[in-house]
Amino acid sequence: MSNYIETAFMQQRTDFMKTLPDRRKRFSIPDGVDMYLDIEYVNDQNEAHRLDVFRPSESPDKELPIIFNVHGGGLIMGCKEFNRYFCARLCKLGYVVFSIEYRLVPEYTFYLSLIHI
């Protein structure tokens, strides 16, 4: 049974990720947002330990409130790129937004998925 569930999750994740290029075309980042992409936040060369930072262009030296965005997907699917437009819109409201990637189940245990969030 667990192999069936794991296979279903993996297929759902694959199907979900196929929509990423179309989402990038439909949702452009608004002007006035500086993006810093794929910054390593754990020194282990794991692609799942990257974050994106969104900062309003017009206030590079100003202290601003921070939002940490953790993408949804029940720890089994999703990626920070799916929330890129949402994070940019929050940035336009005057926030610095950190959007993190994290390890997913079943490649990693539930605990290892949560430890860096």
Spans of model-derived segments:
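Conserved catalytic-core motifs of eukaryotic protein kinase domains, centered on the activation segment
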Residues: 79-81, 109-110
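Short beta-to-alpha linker loops that shape the active-site pocket of alpha/beta-hydrolase fold enzymes
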Residues: 57, 96, 101-105
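Short amphipathic alpha-helix adjacent to the substrate-entry channel of hydrolases
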Residues: 81-98
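Glycine-rich "HGGG/HGxG" loop immediately N-terminal to the catalytic nucleophile
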Residues: 104-112
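Short beta-strand element of the alpha/beta-hydrolase
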Residues: 63-72
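Conserved small/polar residues in nucleotide/adenosyl-binding loops
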Residues: 115-117
